[in-house]
């Protein structure tokens, strides 16, 4: 069974109106201070993990109590995940760290169907969550021997540079005939795609973070954890296959010209990286200040191409979420997604991921246009490298019902008496059961077609069950 840890956070919340504090994200005004405290012990007989599979935190935001439900992002790393760095004499050093018991979670706020969360629990709680349409950031405060955390909105982070930041991709690439109607595009979990990526960190990043490889790794892991949530809405799993750090020097000429650097990176990937690490896509993360307002660039409709399934991203913000959105943006170009135009929407008042101008208030959602363009490209071009499902890293042992593990040969990992869909002796689905859980699953049966499973955001339309899946398919139409 997925081990459940119920944690209540006792929060003394103190809004600091007009005051400021220096946090990892920068100088922050108007924040709340909270003190997490674990009150509930582990269930009797449960095995203690360093980081539990499931956690719940209760706290107040603006005086209102909320419950944050978190689940470990078990698909974050590939089974053969590797890390590479270089010695002073130029030797390549490859390691395969144990990543099963990592500390990166995704989740939601209870009783808020539109909420999301992306949290690192490595050293306190750090990340962001969306509550009632508003995005909040949370991170530990830099106070010795204290459990204090700050909760705040991005708008309260003082901006050092107000200049517009843009993707360097232009709209003049060769286009293909789009599908005529959104209703022609029907995507389900059976068509899920799997994108294994490698992040390459250049030497300017090493200098920026003072050679602290642990800090660089945490920064990258947090970014990937964020974008996995964004890509779930496109039915694409993002898996980190490798992280390469150019610890001593750059292996290509990293220029301020985004075009030249992208070309060099693609050529290097084709002749070097692709032969060492199994992956579908590579992204270069640099602290080099690219020319003009450009903070990212990628080839369009290039997935699986050895030289062109690449992008570059400038580490342009101290707010991890903003760099993560830029990364998600460039990767989407590789999947055939163009920049959003005026008619594209991801909810009333929201700026979507594929806006050509990287908006500080951007949500981590793709627009209806992006959804259609991505799957139009996948269906027409059928890039083969994203078809294979990576191996899972779950524990494998003799299947025993109710033993807290999801093992080979079992459909379920909890005491089956708690779920009418399962046979307690075999941990297999009962005859006639269609599903176990999901927004369109009710007592082991798919909900009827037309049942609302996700309420609209703003002017968007509701999402409806299709009668053939437990998942809630995204409505391709928009208001």
From Swiss-Prot:
Keywords: Calcium, Cell adhesion impairing toxin, Disulfide bond, Hemostasis impairing toxin, Hydrolase, Metal-binding, Metalloprotease, Platelet aggregation inhibiting toxin, Protease, Secreted, Signal, Toxin, Zinc, Zymogen. Disulfide bonds join 304-385, 344-369, 346-352, 435-441, 440-465, 453-472. Residues 193-390 form the Peptidase M12B domain. It comes from the Eukaryota. The active site is at 330. It is found in: Secreted. Residues 398-479 form the Disintegrin domain. Gene3D superfamilies: Collagenase (Catalytic Domain), Disintegrin domain. Binds 1 zinc ion per subunit. The keyword Secreted applies. GO terms for biological process: proteolysis. SUPFAM superfamilies: Blood coagulation inhibitor (disintegrin), Metalloproteases ('zincins'), catalytic domain. Residues 1-20 form the signal peptide. Zn(2+) binds at residues 329, 333, 339. Residues 21-187, 390-414 form a propeptide. Its EC number is 3.4.24.-. Expressed by the venom gland. GO terms for molecular function: calcium ion binding; metalloendopeptidase activity; toxin activity; zinc ion binding. Its cofactor is Zn(2+). GO terms for cellular component: extracellular region; plasma membrane. Coiled coil: none annotated. PANTHER family: ADAM A DISINTEGRIN AND METALLOPROTEASE DOMAIN, DISINTEGRIN AND METALLOPROTEINASE DOMAIN-CONTAINING PROTEIN 28. The disintegrin belongs to the medium disintegrin subfamily. Monomer. This is Zinc metalloproteinase/disintegrin. The gene is wbfib4.
